[in-house]
Amino acid sequence: MANAEKTSSGSDIDEKKRKRKLSNRESARRSRLKKQKLMEDTIHEISSLERRIKENSERCRAVKQRLDSVETENAGLRSEKIWLSSYVSDLENMIATTSLTLTQSGGGDCVDDQNANAGIAVGDCRRTPWKLSCGSLQPMASFKT
């Protein structure tokens, strides 16, 4: 009977070893599948990120081109602003000089271009010098545009 118990307990041990081996194999298989799934997910994420990097690079390039264009336009506008400021200043100087000349010469009444033949006095040329023509107004200097 002792021999039968040994055989019975020996087969129990063999059965436990067999179950453990089977369990280990199944665990290893699950680990391999898990690792494979993780690898596939990582590869998918990498390709997705590479695509996003490419899209963002293209957007960045377009924004840089637009920035260059806007900076060029801005430089042109700044230059034009400087020129226009100078032009306005020259016109203001011309108006001031003309007004001073009119004041010193005693002139002041001007005739509207449309009513020049009728001789209708409009008033002081300083009010709207661009709409009036005065015989007493002579440019003091030549202004180039």
From Swiss-Prot:
Annotated region described as Basic motif, given as residue ranges: 16-37
UniProt region (Disordered), positions on chain: 1-39
One Pfam family this sequence matches: bZIP_2
Induction (free text): Reversibly repressed by glucose and mannose. Slowly induced by Pseudomonas syringae. Induced in roots upon cold and salt stress but then repressed in leaves. Promoted by low energy stress and dark-induced starvation.
GO BP terms: anther dehiscence; cellular response to glucose stimulus; cellular response to starvation; positive regulation of DNA-templated transcription; regulation of amino acid metabolic process; response to bacterium; response to osmotic stress; response to salt stress
Chief localisation class: nucleus
Domain of life: Eukaryota
Any one annotated GO CC term: nucleus
bZIP domain boundaries: 14-77
Keywords per UniProt: Activator, DNA-binding, Nucleus, Transcription, Transcription regulation
UniProt biased composition (Polar residues): 1-11
GO molecular function: DNA-binding transcription factor activity; protein heterodimerization activity; sequence-specific DNA binding; transcription cis-regulatory region binding
InterPro entries on file: bZIP, bZIP_plant_GBF1, bZIP_sf
Region (Leucine-zipper): 46-53
Free-text function comment from the UniProt entry: Transcription factor that binds to the C-box-like motif (5'-TGCTGACGTCA-3') and G-box-like motif (5'-CCACGTGGCC-3'), ABRE elements, of gene promoters involved in sugar signaling. Activated by low energy stress both at transcriptional and post-transcriptional mechanisms. Promotes dark-induced senescence and participates in the transcriptional reprogramming of amino acid metabolism during the dark-induced starvation response. Transcription activator of the mannan synthase CSLA9. Recognizes and binds to DNA-specific sequence of CSLA9 promoter.
Family as reported in the entry's similarity comment: Belongs to the bZIP family.
Protein name: Basic leucine zipper 1
Organism: Arabidopsis thaliana
Lineage: Eukaryota, Viridiplantae, Streptophyta, Embryophyta, Tracheophyta
